[in-house]
Amino acid sequence: AGGALSSSTSDIWKNFLANSQDRPILIEKIVQYSKDNNLDGVDVDLEWSHVTEGYSDFVIELKEKLAANSLGMTAAFPSETKYSLITSEALNAFDFINIMAYDYTGPWNASSPGQHSSLNHAQRGVNYWKNIIGVNGEKLTLGVPFYGYNFESSTTVNSFTYGSMVASSVSNADRDNVGNKYYNGRPTIRDKVKLAAETMSGIMIWELGQDSFTEYSLLETIHKKY
């Protein structure tokens, strides 16, 4: 639920979250959709300005209905930010918290090319959520990107997939950058999987469709490392 939202869609979410009479209607539809499509649960991916008044109440109410139907609830949160409007009760309601340890730079920072998702970024995210916020590692998963950013232009930064880099040259599978194109290759993914295996419950991927569907697959790299 959520993710990248247009301004009009964002307003709809804000209105639902703030309205205690409308929230139950939305929640019932989410639960029914999950059941109709044989889903395991819901990931609440409302980010930044979309975390508004009513968010915590929504999460707590949604959790109650999902749990009653044996469905799980997770959230995707920035690597080193806890939104001030999220209460401790709401935070504890999630079965897992997915740490989005990527997008440390991107199109919004075109003049400063660099890695958007390094091992150090991942380590910082784990430290923040475990040691500063105090979430048990058993409830945390580490987000890894199957995409990167192209900083070859000083004015326009575009994203690209790991799969496209491997298609260009299989040697790119074991690199983290080609010129000013930055991404995660297999060695860095292995290091991140090791970090996750030692300190938390698993790996979250954004997103599977960006992988290389060959012997150089990052998903296969994750499976082999685990």
Give the location of each predicted region.
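Substrate-binding cleft of extracellular glycoside hydrolase catalytic domains
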Residues: A1-V42, L46-S49
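Acidic glycine-/aspartate-rich tracts in secreted/extracellular proteins
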Residues: G3-S6, P145-Y149, G209-D211
